[in-house]
Amino acid sequence: MSTHGLQVQGISKRYGDTVALADMSFEVHPGELFGFVGSNGAGKTTTMRIALGVLEADEGQVLLGGRPVDLDVRRRIGYMPEERGLYPKMKVGAQLAYIAQLHGLSRAEAADAVHRWTTRLDIAHRVDDTVSALSLGNQQRVQLAAALVHDPEVLVLDEPFSGLDPVAVDVMSHVLVEKCEAGVPVIFSSHQLELVERLCHRVGIVRAGHMQAVGTVDELRDRGTTQLEVHAPGAAPGWADGLPGVRTVGVRDGRTVLELLPGADDQAVLAAALRTGPVHSFAVRQSSLTELFREVVAA
């Protein structure tokens, strides 16, 4: 298995007066799951299509292992588009074998790969059905099999979990983790931010064609504000008002949620809470990726 990483270096793309991408740069390392998140129209799909070589960037380049993406490199990429990219009236098995052979596998190698991946994705019993006869979830499984059937050196997946039931989400998650553990760089976009937070090593947040933030979830948390949750049952409303660098966000499950600006003293907050009576809990609240995403795109 290749240990090549995927490098996106300063790519820009315009459509007339519309800027789709502006100096988009990031890297997906070998054996890394990279989550690519952003609102609709932020530039995720355009970036992925340029990475695959389907679209040409106006500026910048995409490299796999230091080599520009040409026809030979494209054959080594597994791509799963958000929209269905399969022939609806063609049988599943024949279609996957055809795709495998397009990527350079022999007829026998393609047959073995089709059997392996349809079994792994629990669709082996549907290989003689047409794609149009399948549920949307099973069509999504076939689409993933099409991205995997040629044993790619990098995976680029656009909304791979869309429309899947929880069992299918687990199957697909396990497959992506396995490919990652084998050294494959995996990038996928998703609006299911809880899933991205659970699976990904690093996350890139895109807004209006720009990479706004990139890093581990913990690194993204360090960029934002710190929140405290304080359970002081005897405290009157507004008990933290006036503390330097402290803003009351609200009350959640009986606990006061406070936002600390840089330089604020959490021990001063604890002392103020203790002056109101017993303090049952006092803890830093970890922001979810969904909350971090809102902070970044609203900045």
Range-by-range predicted roles:
Residues V73, R221-G224, V296-V297:
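Short, flexible helix/strand-to-coil boundary loops that buttress conserved ligand/catalytic motifs
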Residues T3, L261-A299:
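C-terminal coupling/interaction segments
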Residues Q9, H231, A283-R285:
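Solvent-exposed beta-strand sheet faces enriched in polar/charged residues
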Residues V171-L260:
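ABC transporter nucleotide-binding domain
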Residues T3-L6, K13-R207, A213:
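ABC transporter nucleotide-binding domains
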Residues D70, G93, L193, C200, ...:
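Alpha-helix N-cap/helix-start and coil->helix boundary motif
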